[in-house]
Structures are given as C-alpha cells and as structure tokens.
C-alpha cells in the first residue's frame, strides 16, 4: 500500500529559466508529492510529460566541473573491464564518453542515447554516435560491453522498459554501471532539494534488487561517491553470466532499519 512520504506542495519545473520575475510568478506549477510502498519504492504522485521536461533541455553536463572530474575518475573504475563498445544512456553533451575517450589507449565505439535533440552536433563533432530517442529495447544497437547511466535512471517513469532495454542491449558478459543519488543518504542529510519533477523515482537498493531479478539482472558490486549529495554506483550484470556477491546486503539491512517518515517530517 502506497503512503504519502513527502509533500512539498506545488512547484514550477526547475530547468525553466525566466527572463522576468513576472514570468516566473506566472509559471505553471505542478504537484510535488511523493509516496512510498511496502518495497520501499519511492516515487512522485505526478509524472510530467517527457516532452515538457526534455525537448528543450537547457542543462549541459560540461558546465558542472565536479561532474566532469567525476567522469574522468570513473574511467579508472571501469577500464579493466572489456570496453570496446560503450553505450551511455542520457549522456547529454557527451561529457562522460568524452572523458572515456580522452583517457583510453584503445579504440572505442561510443554511443549516446538521449531523448533531447539539443546535443546532437556536439556529440557528433566528438566522434560519438548520437541516438536521439528514449532508451528502449526496440532500438537497433550493437551489444554493449558497458552501459552507463549516471544520474538518469531516477528520471525515467518507465523503469521497467529501461530494464528490458538493458537486458537486450547488454552483452552476455557486459556490465551496466548505474549511478543515482542514493535516497538513504538524501533522507539522512535532509536534502529536500533532491525532490523535483525530473526525479520521478528516489531509488533505494531494496526495490531495485527485486526489479533487477525480474529482468535477469543482479548487483555484483557497489561504490559510494560524494557527487550529488551522495551517489550510489551499482555494477549490474546478467544473472546467467555472473555469481552472487552479497554486494547489496549491507544496504538492504540499513534501509530496513531507517525511519523514512521521521526524516521526511524534518525536511
């Protein structure tokens, strides 16, 4: 049974930049209320149509210098994996894939699948194939040695369609590197500003383990990062080509004990 967890009233879309105070005051506002279910899946009550959120998307990853540094560091975590073909989902202006290419001594086939048309030319100029579409299993893509999605999965109301796409496009022995603001840290530190309309889900490990299992996937490794107020990086593989590691166990225990309603009351 879903229960209201955090209600922040109504809010405008955060990536709209207004020229005047009056424009801002007249902006359309949408409900900003979230629920939690028995599996600790937290999501917004209201999903804003993707066309309103992303067709004229103003945010550029490259202006976020801590994120650029984060991308450069990520290469050192994954370079030991097979990495001939890498697909980045929601790769924006190509910041992550550019960081990989600049540090790799091997030729890389790099593909950015992004719903916004705003970044096509910038990616193509960098030698990155750009697929202007939502990540889905109907796309014609080569099997990926690595799929990356950094600060993207929580933006996706169609989480199960996303997982079906991972299952199809990830090579048998490939690894999906998933990053998201870790919601346990969000509540521990009362970061209410993580709640906005682009973030439809607020992920914990508990519901993800169940979702991954449904699509034949499992967590094989975890790393915590400081970016975005506390990010969890999960390494995910096909169950058919990986062994259980217990990597998620400590997170499952911590989430079961935590008082999310008490923290929400203090936000």
What are these regions (language model features)?
Residues 178-201, 205-207, 212:
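Short, glycine-/aromatic-enriched active-site segment of Class I SAM-dependent methyltransferases
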């Amino acid at each position: 049974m879903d229960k209201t967890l955090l209600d922040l009233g109504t809010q405008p879309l955060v990536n709209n930049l207004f020229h005047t105070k009056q424009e801002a005051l007249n902006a359309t506002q949408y409900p900003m209320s979230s629920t939690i279910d028995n599996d600790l899946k937290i999501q917004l009550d209201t999903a804003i149509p993707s066309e309103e959120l992303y067709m004229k998307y103003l945010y550029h990853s490259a202006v976020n210098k801590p994120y650029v540094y984060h991308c450069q560091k990520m290469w050192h975590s994954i370079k030991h994996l097979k990495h001939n073909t890498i697909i980045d989902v929601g790769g924006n202006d190509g910041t992550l894939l550019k960081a990989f290419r600049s540090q790799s001594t091997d030729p890389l086939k790099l593909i950015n699948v992004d719903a916004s048309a705003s970044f096509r030319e910038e990616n193509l100029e960098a030698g990155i194939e750009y697929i202007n579409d939502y990540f889905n299993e109907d796309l014609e893509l080569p099997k990926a040695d690595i799929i990356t999605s950094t600060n993207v999965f929580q933006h996706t109301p169609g989480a199960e369609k996303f997982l079906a796409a991972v299952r199809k496009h990830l090579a048998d022995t490939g690894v999906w590197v998933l990053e998201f603001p870790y919601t346990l840290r969000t509540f521990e530190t009362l970061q209410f500003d993580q709640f906005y309309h682009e973030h439809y889900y607020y992920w914990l490990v508990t519901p993800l383990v169940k979702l991954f299992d449904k699509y034949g996937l499992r967590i094989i490794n975890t790393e915590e990062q400081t970016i975005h107020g506390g990010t969890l990086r999960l390494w995910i593989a096909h169950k058919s080509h990986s062994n259980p590691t217990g990597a998620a166990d400590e997170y499952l225990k911590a989430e079961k004990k935590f008082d999310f309603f008490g923290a929400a009351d203090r936000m």
